[in-house]
């Protein structure tokens, strides 16, 4: 793996040569339905202070999420564990790439403390890829889940994990910790993996999600994709079928937004009515829940969606019993 880093860029972020040496791509002007208001509120400031005081990293900031103001105003945040430097260089992602630092042994306790301070009823925990670790960070995920359970027993826990590619036994460690929701994003259709997500393997990710259900059928499974990367509609429908074949409960679909000129270009902005059609089709395919809109992101409205997931499962069980 190449370890020379490029830090000469507008944001000062670490840039893997694979990204730094890419030709510039035009950043298209966003249509009106993509733009979001950015109010600064007391809730936003309080959330930021809790994150800073506990020395935590959030994917909200690192990935430049368009929903950060809305979520932080409500004291919702997605914590990103195992540092802020990723070992992969996906073409869509704005997170820094390079050689990560050692794991912080105090991080599980700090995450749990922040969850309690914020009074979260549902927390989302994600991470960078840590291909440098023997278990891909599985034990660390389990320790964070354990710490949150001890500090806030009533809080439900959703994790958004990397693929643990070539990390034998890692998935079993995470599932054994019993998160309430296991999310692993496919990100895009298989034909786009070579350019968009070159370090990952589409069918490995499908199998990962399927294996979660085999290990513990009570855990909700979830996966998301971005659209606007040049995929065809029929490819999205086939991807839905692949997820359902893995018994995935919940799917999210959102518009890809290009972070910088060095990232994969937006091929097109998908219109809101197309997103609505994907939601309708997804429900007919058997998902318990489908969230599909231009600004949908994996963790957006995660707490509300968890309540909907539970209700949908209960309704399904009731219909089967009658």
UniProtKB/Swiss-Prot annotation:
GO cellular component, one term: cytoplasm
The protein's required cofactors: [4Fe-4S] cluster
Chain positions recorded as [4Fe-4S] cluster 1 binding sites: 60, 65, 71, 299
Keyword Metal-binding among UniProt keywords: yes
PANTHER family per record: LIPOYL SYNTHASE (PTHR10949), LIPOYL SYNTHASE, MITOCHONDRIAL (PTHR10949:SF0)
Coiled coil location: none
Binding site for [4Fe-4S] cluster 2: 86, 90, 93
Name of this chain's protein: Lipoyl synthase
Co-factor note (free text): Binds 2 [4Fe-4S] clusters per subunit. One cluster is coordinated with 3 cysteines and an exchangeable S-adenosyl-L-methionine.
UniProt-annotated location(s): Cytoplasm
Region (Disordered): 1-22
Source organism: Brucella ovis (strain ATCC 25840 / 63/290 / NCTC 10512)
Ranges annotated as biased composition (Polar residues): 1-12
Catalytic activity: [[Fe-S] cluster scaffold protein carrying a second [4Fe-4S](2+) cluster] + N(6)-octanoyl-L-lysyl-[protein] + 2 oxidized [2Fe-2S]-[ferredoxin] + 2 S-adenosyl-L-methionine + 4 H(+) = [[Fe-S] cluster scaffold protein] + N(6)-[(R)-dihydrolipoyl]-L-lysyl-[protein] + 4 Fe(3+) + 2 hydrogen sulfide + 2 5'-deoxyadenosine + 2 L-methionine + 2 reduced [2Fe-2S]-[ferredoxin]
Organism superkingdom: Bacteria
Principal location class: cytoplasm
Molecular function terms from GO: 4 iron, 4 sulfur cluster binding; lipoate synthase activity; metal ion binding
EC assignment: 2.8.1.8
Keywords: 4Fe-4S, Cytoplasm, Iron, Iron-sulfur, Metal-binding, S-adenosyl-L-methionine, Transferase
Pathway annotation: Protein modification; protein lipoylation via endogenous pathway; protein N(6)-(lipoyl)lysine from octanoyl-[acyl-carrier-protein]: step 2/2
UniProt record similarity statement: Belongs to the radical SAM superfamily. Lipoyl synthase family.
Top class in the EC scheme: transferase
All copies of domain Radical SAM core, residue ranges: 72-288
